[in-house]
Amino acid sequence: MAKGQSLQDPFLNALRRERVPVSIYLVNGIKLQGQIESFDQFVILLKNTVSQMVYKHAISTVVPSRPVSHHSNNAGGGASNNYHHGSNVQGSTAQQDSEETE
């Protein structure tokens, strides 16, 4: 599980540290919005008008409102410049479509 944490933790920590507004999509389709206040191995504390504890197993996607650099130990390499929300092109297209309609 340490390998999975090595991606999650720097990404979530950058979102928390920079107070980036995020949209969190749950596996049941519900969209939550706010800022990541804190997180641990199992939950994310999301703050908006109220704080909500969201279990990670219920999360499908975390979408930042703007790009963040989450590879702090990367010396300017290409990985920190590649901004992806998901593992496929279709997911990125869906996000762009939703941004255009807002």
Curated annotation (Swiss-Prot):
Pfam families in UniProt: Hfq
GO molecular function annotations of the record: RNA binding
Annotated Low complexity bias: 70-88
Cellular component, GO annotation: cytosol
Biological process annotations from GO: regulation of DNA-templated transcription; regulation of RNA stability; regulation of translation, ncRNA-mediated
Family in the record: Belongs to the Hfq family.
Subunit structure: Homohexamer.
Protein's name in the database: RNA-binding protein Hfq
Organism listed in the record: Salmonella gallinarum (strain 287/91 / NCTC 13346)
Classification of source organism: Bacteria, Pseudomonadati, Pseudomonadota, Gammaproteobacteria, Enterobacterales
Gene: hfq
